[in-house]
Amino acid sequence: MSGDSERAVAPGVVPAPCASKVELRLSCRHLLDRDPLTKSDPSVVLLQQAQGQWLQVDRTEVVKSSLHPVFSKVFTVDYYFEGVQKLRFEVYDTHGPSGLTCQDDDFLGGMECTLGQIVAQKKMTRPLLLRFGRNAGKSTITVIAEDISGNNGYVELSFQARKLDDKDLFSKSDPFLELYRVNDDGSEQLVYRTEVVKNNLNPVWEPFKVSLNSLCSCEETRPLKCLVWDYDSRGKHDFIGDFTTTFAEMQKAFEEEQQAQWDCVNAKYKQKKRNYKNSGVVILADLKLHRVHSFLDYIMGGCQIHCTVAIDFTASNGDPRNSCSLHHINPYQPNEYLRALVAVGEVCQDYDSDKRFSALGFGARIPPKYEVSHDFAINFNPEDDECEGIQGVVEAYQNCLPKVQLYGPTNVAPIISKVARMAAAEESTGEASQYYILLILTDGVVTDMSDTREAIVRASHLPMSVIIVGVGNADFTDMQILDGDDGVLRSPRGEPALRDIVQFVPFRELKNASPAALAKCVLAEVPKQVVEYYSHKELPPRSLGAQTGEAAASSAP
């Protein structure tokens, strides 16, 4: 066994937008020995290249006095198939506390690669190189990648032990516990290593969290192996005992007894001693299973996506009778409004059982009094603004154009507030049954920016998302304010949005894209936003709602 740190180890996270998530596990062999009296105390730093610069993002724990360390800390990174993501792993002999600073540490070697290379190989071993490309002796680093995008949550575990064997002459043992997953090929993968509890035969280790994928590859009957050691500062830890179990067994025992325990057995002692029973007892004091639901979990659980379309009828679009107008109807060439409307609508309608769209307009003078309206039904039925399918919206739009006078200004806050009222009514049901998408199609920057920011911040607490597609060639720079990608959107009063619910897309950047590519870009953020909302509200998919009551309290949060 390799060395151990004196601290518990928790997963590290590289912050990034939602994508396929990959866990990286690290180990090294034959490291250089930089310490004259003992072995090196290695740790690994992860760097990621961004805009040509190497940025240090995380670091493993320190493994004491080991030239062949197996690190417990896991790096979680986001993987994009379409991009080249350059990573660098640097190994240091660590002096003092392990933080993100390496200036006092001895460099033992580094390795550069791409995340794609690691993912393609799943397990990659490379030599470590010193400065100027020189080999660091026989030193190697191994990186194992696991896709956790489909994981189904994480578990909190809390272990303690009783009456462990005393391995020390002048004091009591300093125990720590290691939890391993047994892989299909029989190999063992370190999942977690607890902190060391000094001078104690009845240790209580700190609770820890681990993903189900890391723990058991989401297979609850997969064998798990727990080993208990007496810590030695020189890395020569004394084996106390072990036991084998499964996550399913843990759950069953914990639910029945509110506590599960196993004999911690040293096989060598069992063979030699006739009356040997165990080297102590390990107790699972707490188990909490936290299910993490995906977008598809909610959709398949019965959550409906209701889409509202809001179309800009301001005068800046140009007279629809003029072929240069953004609203000009050409039977052979759909205008930008229609292209965006159809591309997004055809995707959304698959998630709504009645396939009905609310279709609204803003910025026009409407009959019969031709007063300016910033919230009117384009079918001119204020009692029922819904249209049958996306084709119904197209027909209502084409029929509406000759009947209205394009005017202004470009105010969208009233429509955002209208959809927010529907979403608020849905929120009060306490179920994950309906999520609202507002698609705003506009040819210019909104003129009621303060009111719009206020409306979006309020809406960020509700089950809704806002997608804004900018059509035409206007300067949409100011619209990026509403998209929270560059920082948290705030209301004029300074209140921050709870979630980033706005996606802004200039249509001209996708003018030559296929409808599928356009829809993919426009709707890219929606699945994440749906999951974020229901996760924040701690609402499971409707089909799982019955499992969240007190009956499941022993194995659910």
Swiss-Prot record:
Entry keyword annotation includes Cell membrane: yes
Localization (cell): Cytoplasm; Nucleus; Cell membrane
Keyword rRNA-binding appears in the UniProt entry: no
Binding-site positions, Ca(2+) 2: D168, D230, D232, D238
InterPro entries assigned: C2_dom (IPR000008), C2_domain_sf (IPR035892), C2B_Copine (IPR037768), Copine (IPR045052), Copine_C (IPR010734), VWF_A (IPR002035), vWFA_dom_sf (IPR036465)
Keyword terms of this UniProt record: Calcium, Cell membrane, Cytoplasm, Membrane, Metal-binding, Nucleus, Repeat
Domain C2, residue spans: 1-128, 135-263
GO molecular function: calcium-dependent phospholipid binding; metal ion binding
A Pfam short name: Copine
This protein's domain notes: The C2 domain 1 is not necessary for calcium-mediated translocation and association to the plasma membrane. The C2 domain 2 is necessary for calcium-mediated translocation and association to the plasma membrane.
Function as written in the Swiss-Prot or TrEMBL entry: Calcium-dependent phospholipid-binding protein that may play a role in calcium-mediated intracellular processes.
The name this protein goes by in its record: Copine-7
Origin species: Mus musculus (Mouse)
